[in-house]
């Protein structure tokens, strides 16, 4: 890399995009500073000098958020950034997915790519700057990275596609798409959409690719100017003679084992076939390195045979046709005391989702770099080890769980009613009980069932399906509803979720260089057929959301007051609102516009709290008659509470028509009496009269005669 700082500039959507190379982090293999508008991201790539003895490529990608980037100091006692936010984890995955396929097969050096967000302009997405920065850091380094990639966000406002839409444009857009790829093809898609047809989603992807081509060309010029020569790669390879021997000895056994249709029986058959071959070589007392090579060759054979059977003979491991979905079943109200639950089973993949309804005060508070401060709809995904019949430590959610949860959330959020129509916080938890591929899509289906069981008035039911691809040269086969083996050994995992009307979420990961438009179009079309079949199965279980909420769900009353009356409800230091909560046991959430949401499982207490609040904000009207309660007696009169928080004085001369010597001669504490409002003085004091009410009653009787 050049020792002196070099600057390279272009534009993205009219905003300046500048790359600095050669000044910062010079001890790393490659580094660059990206300035996109006022967004600044430092991307750095490093690699170990020697390969690791691992059966996989050890790549780590981190997207690091610094709260100083938006002028915030972290909360808590420590005042440091803690664990990564959900946005940071999802952005790390977003960058990892398009760059991972572009390292040489068999490359085992440890590679770490870190992008640190140092300044944020909300209209210039930091994750896009980090993705392009990661590609540049790898491309200018000596790490063997095959070719640059770029990524963009795509929105659609009033039918027009937009690259990297602003915050204002995002609010109006019916598509939230992130697409990445090389100059030749797409290799990563992440999208949420408002029931958008497949053909429009495809056009959005291809629209994004046109901008990607330009940004890759920009990077290629940059690499010519300051890129380094790549270091020699030591690839994990096996001896040719050994490969031939293992193939001849194991092929028939491997082919037969692969075609055992039941997952566990197939896994056991493959394991037994491998063990027999390994045992044969161990009997010959060969070196440990040879045994490792034999195991690697056998793993490759399984992959090659699965792929050959699919592409050449159109035979899937479990015997299905390429567009066939595994057996489907579903049911609702699985758990009696939860607010809603749904169980969805597709072959040997099973998810149980639970819907919990809460008050609007139960929203998730977000503390990150985005403008969004809270979230009222959440989907969480859990993947225990028992779902694949294994043991293992129980830890908090990892990147995969967070990513799958976010995908389900994105797929479902477009059908969630707004808080005016349905003033609840909604939390979905999906428990994966069995896993043989496509668990994230099963969680979407189960979550739809759970919400319908809970009585959430969703706009339309959502189903999801995972598509696969096996490509060999120009031959390719697209698979519907891929299982675990097809996902692990295939070239693509393309998840599509949506309603009968259109797509609500897409996620595509591939292990090859990229996909053409024709393959994407065919995959989307095939996915739609599968989605419709799954929706039909789900609707046979429950056709529409239940009309009544669960008896165990909180009941919510809504009301509206004038914003300047909010202080009357809250009271000094929250005294008034806490008194209402203590008296009724409800939860009260107040919005700045005067909207009030009262929630509890007891509707009578909700009504009581509402009445108290109505009394607090009620205005006393001169000339009106009220039934009040005597609260305090003085020599000069009685203080009467008209309603909660409002009282007035009945002067001793206004208690009765005749002269009153002592207030106690007419009224006592806690007496209920009818009083008329005579006046409200300049200080807001209310003067009442019992005598006026008596006189009015006499007049009314005389007029009635």
From Swiss-Prot:
Its cofactor is Mg(2+). Mg(2+) binds at residues 487, 493. Residues 554-613 form the KH domain. One of its GO terms (cellular component) is cytosol. One of its GO terms (biological process) is RNA processing. It holds the Pfam family S1. It catalyses: RNA(n+1) + phosphate = RNA(n) + a ribonucleoside 5'-diphosphate. CDD domains: KH-I_PNPase (cd02393), RNase_PH_PNPase_1 (cd11363), RNase_PH_PNPase_2 (cd11364), S1_PNPase (cd04472). InterPro entries: ExoRNase_PH_dom1, ExoRNase_PH_dom2, ExoRNase_PH_dom2_sf, KH_dom, KH_dom_type_1, KH_dom_type_1_sf, NA-bd_OB-fold, PNPase. Belongs to the polyribonucleotide nucleotidyltransferase family. Involved in mRNA degradation. Catalyzes the phosphorolysis of single-stranded polyribonucleotides processively in the 3'- to 5'-direction. This is Polyribonucleotide nucleotidyltransferase. It comes from Oceanobacillus iheyensis (strain DSM 14371 / CIP 107618 / JCM 11309 / KCTC 3954 / HTE831). The gene is pnp.
